[in-house]
Amino acid sequence: MIMYDVKITAQRKADYKDLQAKYENPIEHTCDVQEGQTWISHDGMCPEGMCESAWESMHKFVEALARGEGDFYDGWMRNPYSAMISCNDGFRPVSFLLERI
């Protein structure tokens, strides 16, 4: 089976300080992903240095793109071999563009 590489690009990073102040316990280390940062997934595997929480949110889409699948949710993306996925951090979500390459 042919497996494609998938490029993962951090597109946007939000920071909801009001929600953090109201609900979050103080933490030592926050997300260090930078907008524009990229990773390449080979064979649908988690790239080195990828945030585990972000990977958990996106891995099913990365694996599907790596297998050549696409057109998620019946035409959701202009490029059928891509997806826009956000990590599951409700205080500092990052939006990632996944693209089959």
How would you name each of these model-derived features?
Residues 2, 35, 88-92:
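Solvent-exposed loop and beta-edge segments used for protein-protein assembly and interaction
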Residues 2-8:
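Short structural boundary motif marking the start of a folded domain
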Residues 6, 41, 94-96:
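Hydrophobic residues positioned within well-ordered beta-strands of beta-sheet architectures
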Residues 9-11, 42, 99-101:
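A structural detector for beta-sheet-dominated domains
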Residues 10, 15-25:
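Short, structured beta-strand/loop micro-motifs enriched in basic residues and often containing a Trp
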Residues 46-57:
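Short, Lys/Arg- and Gly-enriched loop/turn segments at beta-strand edges
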